[in-house]
Amino acid sequence: MKISRHAYADTYGPTTGDRVRLADTDLWIKVERDLTTYGDEVKFGGGKVIRDGMGQSQLSRDQVMDLVITNALIVDHWGIIKADVGIKDGRIAAIGKAGNPDTQPNVDINIGAATEVIAGEGKILTAGGIDSHVHFICPQLVEEALTSGVTTLIGGGTGPATGTNATTCTPGSWNIGRMLQAADAFPINMGFLGKGNASLPQSLEEQVRAGVLGLKLHEDWGTTPAAIDNCLSVAERFDVQVTIHTDTLNESGFVEDTIAAFKDRTIHTYHTEGAGGGHAPDIIKACGEANVLPSSTNPTTPFTANTIDEHLDMLMVCHHLDPSIPEDVAFAESRIRRETISAEDALHDMGALSMHGSDSQAMGRVGEVILRTWQSASVMKRDRGTLPEDKGDHDNFRIKRYIAKYTINPAITHGIAHEIGSIEVGKLADLVLWKPAFFGVKPSLVLKGGVIVTAPMGDPNASIPTPQPVHYRPMFGSFGGSRTASCVSFVSQAGLDEGIGEKLGLQKRLVAVKNIRGLRKSDLIHNNALPRIEVDPQNYQVRADGQLLWFEPSKVLPMAQRYFLF
């Protein structure tokens, strides 16, 4: 029996060689492989395959999956493939062909009476996003992040304190303890950064032992060469990451002095970008260093006609500046440069900027990490054309490059890639399911540890799930013991050794970060380019390996108003 490609895609989703458009962007994915078996696909529903004695076996719970996502189109850094995904005990247990081994060939994902099913036909499955630049200013940001497809938050803060409004630091063991206790209340993974601005090690060591997963150096606390050196020295001893927001005013040195203070040690440079802060005007040079793991944040990506206008007021509020003081205004204006903002998009597209975060409520938007990543990718395809690695009628390599920026690369950078960051066997089942037309904008389901935590849902009093008003609502995975069982808090190994879980009465599983020190940019996936960056000190023009990086700001974007009319 033969079936047309169109009819097959309507029934089981796209297969090898089919192309799928991402939302209303100019980006197209092409299915590289199909791990299901033609004629023996599994599908749930009345008159469908997953029934007793057909696609469902007689095997007991220990031999079958707890959950199977059928016929999903996986989009990850390692490939774009069609497959069934099996989940057991909250982890990804298999990627391949699901069904009943007694009646079907090539089955490596067993379905039984103990198995739940999510229909992935015609949908895209991605790993949950990781936002590695979060100001924990208000708890409500968790819901915004989850409903955008982000399942892990890394950053610092204690609420709407003046220090937190500006810096991603949770300072001191007492504050760290309170935030770890608060993390138990949320259906999302969290990890906290301590304050790294000190010239002697004791106060930093205390914070690492209190359970932070890393330390943050921020110019508002004084990012001097001495503080940088001391902080990195502590991090080397404890195998934690250091994130840095460098010295905009160049008071304690220039970008070359800061890079020298790194002493070739691994560091995650926040705001390696156009307007987010750090050495003016040339912090962007840091993305050409082999020991620097660079990221940028979403207020400047993609560069649009409105970007410059909104930035001055945002900056004045976030960094506690006074518009009546000329020096404060000059400080703010020195950070906002059209030329470096435009170059930021291009450096992302080249793979020179490796990660993308939000800078939540501190100039960035926590619910737009994924959205703006794909907007930027589409704009860069329009402005720079198809990448050399993409041959033919698809954008697979560009898509792998951009998805790595908010999944696997922040996971590698912060020592949590053994748990999350990709759709791979053994990792937590932190997964997001999308309709292609809404990809990157509005997820269909968000799973944490194999449990649905949020989804669009209609009127709870309706006779079916779909009647209006349909909006995101917390699901069962967001409540009670399920919440703490399906999520983790990432901490230092030193914190685990100190017994912080018992001391603080924490309910979430604590996972130690590891394998951080000694990382190089070459360890990051699809985003490890090391161009020679030059910034003209007079006109701020940016060149990478001699090529001018300038593109006009966009006036129209994909994934914008048509998706948010209601």
Curated annotation (Swiss-Prot):
Alphabetic keyword roster: Cytoplasm, Hydrolase, Metal-binding, Nickel
| Listed name of the protein | Urease subunit alpha
State the free-text cofactor note.
Binds 2 nickel ions per subunit.
Query: By its UniProt entry, which Gene3D superfamilies does this protein fall under?
Result: Metal-dependent hydrolases (3.20.20.140), Urease, subunit C, domain 1 (2.30.40.10)
Which PANTHER family would you find in this protein's record?
Answer: UREASE (PTHR43440:SF1)
**What does the entry list as the binding residues for substrate?**
H218
Q: What kind of modification does the protein receive after translation?
A: Carboxylation allows a single lysine to coordinate two nickel ions.
Gene for this chain: ureC
Superkingdom per UniProt: Bacteria
Any single Gene Ontology cellular-component annotation: cytoplasm
